[in-house]
Amino acid sequence: MKQIDVFEYLPQIMRELKKGILVNTKNGDKTNSMTIAWGQVGIEWRKLFFTTYIRHGRFTHEQIENTKEFTVSVPIERTPEIAKAIAYIGSRSGKDINKLADCNLTLVDGIEVNSPAIKEIPLTLECKVIYSQEQEIDKIPAELKEQFYPQNVD
């Protein structure tokens, strides 16, 4: 892995985020990935940030709460195999299965975090949690709740 200037890749990160990218975690010997399609890159407190929202009920949330770190994998080329893997990972919990192994994805050690990168999706953002906040579902407009939270999941 090599370090990159995130701002050079920002258009690609934002384009791919709308289609779905991966958040990866590792806690002890348990790794997990989750598909996300909302997030943002920005600057807070003079630090480069990647912000995403992960609900309490998700295994990924538990992993991040325990480790305070994660990686984000962004496809440079969205091949049919990568698209299929991202869809599969987004449709199952990793609590009892190894979604990455099921998709034949190869884990690569992070440089500054213990959470893995994915060899087949080499554009990786390494992230450490420095701030978290509860999302107030009741403040989300009704039309967005209906569209993005149809199951009324906490």
Regions found by a protein language model. Give the residues of each.
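Active-site-proximal mixed secondary-structure blocks
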Residues: 1-36, 40-154
